[in-house]
Regions:
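Bacterial Sec-dependent N-terminal signal peptides
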Residues: 1-41
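Extended soluble regions of mature proteins
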Residues: 33-309
Length: 309
């Protein structure tokens, strides 16, 4: 990512966010018209990974799905409290020679933004909150992964070789969606993973970055269940376009991306001010400044990949 120069900052119109806080900050949104664009800023306590700008993003079609798999994605936001977790509905779009794993919720929000006005966003802000921002393209380009994600309002892209996952098959079995599944375990990116796969689906793939088993991965979770993916639906007659955003990506590496993400997740307000040129003023219900909210914080969870440091 290229740093923003003082000259560019001076030219940039400063955008000031006044965030009214309820007694318990769970999620906050403000919509405003900026140069005839709709902008929505979402700051989520716990996981600050989403500041969504409600400006429609153009998409480039790179394929057409022939099968789609829906997954429930669950992850802890506080490893000391197993009741604090978040969920998302993810979709794995599969076509000949490649696949895309992305948030179905984010796809829905993007579609909704395109037909909504700023007034509608203000009236029903919860409709525009949620959804993971990352997408993973397997074998795109050939022999590699492409990973895209957002930090604040900035788009990032990195490529990596398709990783080798050394699975050990086990005698464990289970039934998911009527499919008899077999077990396997492996160590990958700093975690011990357990997977259940079936050879009754004509696809050798899986959620997130998983693959390499003699069948389709229906469920996978790490030791401690901090991260878990479970297949909850299969569409064998899909025809939805597989797309990638046409945006100015900051091309980076996996390690550098996680370092940038950590900067934002631990101190989002400073990141927004220094990188995005956005001044953030947080006030409570009484109208008084809440500087405690803008202080840096320590994450109560680990990223899904632990080996990046």
């Amino acid at each position: 990512m290229h740093p923003i120069s003082h000259q560019n900052l001076n030219k940039m119109k400063k955008r000031v966010l006044f965030i009214a806080l309820a007694s318990a900050l769970v999620g906050t949104m403000m919509a405003q018209e900026v140069e005839h664009r709709k902008e929505v800023y979402v700051i989520k306590a716990g996981k600050a990974s989403g500041i969504n700008t409600a400006t429609p993003v153009e998409q480039k079609e790179i394929g057409k799905a022939v099968m789609e798999f829906m997954y429930d994605y669950k992850y802890l936001t506080d490893t000391t409290d197993v009741t604090r977790n978040e969920t998302d509905r993810m979709t794995l779009q599969v076509t000949y020679g490649m696949s895309k794993f992305t948030s179905f919720r984010t796809m829905q929000i993007d579609s909704l933004i395109r037909v909504s006005t700023a007034e509608q966003i203000r009236a029903t802000p919860d409709s525009y909150i949620g959804g993971e921002t990352f997408s993973i393209f397997k074998n795109y380009p050939q022999g590699r992964f492409t990973v895209i994600d957002k930090v604040s309002t900035d788009w990032f892209l990195y490529e990596e070789d398709i990783p080798v996952q050394e699975w050990t098959l086990t005698d464990d079995t289970c039934n998911i969606l009527g499919y008899e599944c077999k077990g396997a375990v492996c160590n990958f990116r700093g975690r011990r993973w357990t997977a259940f796969y079936t050879d009754s689906v004509p696809v050798a793939d899986g959620p997130w970055k998983f693959g390499g088993l003699p069948g389709f991965i229906m469920q996978v979770y790490d030791e401690g269940h901090q991260y878990e993916f479970t297949c909850v639906g299969i569409n064998s007659k899909a025809d939805r376009a597989i797309t990638i955003p046409e945006v100015p990506f900051n091309k980076t590496t996996r390690t550098k991306f996680y370092a940038t993400k950590l900067r934002f997740d631990t101190d989002p307000f400073t990141y927004m001010m220094n990188v995005n040129g956005v001044n953030v003023n947080v006030v409570g219900a009484d109208g008084q400044p809440r500087t405690d909210i803008t202080q840096p914080r320590t994450l109560q969870y680990d990223y899904i990949e632990r080996d990046w440091k």
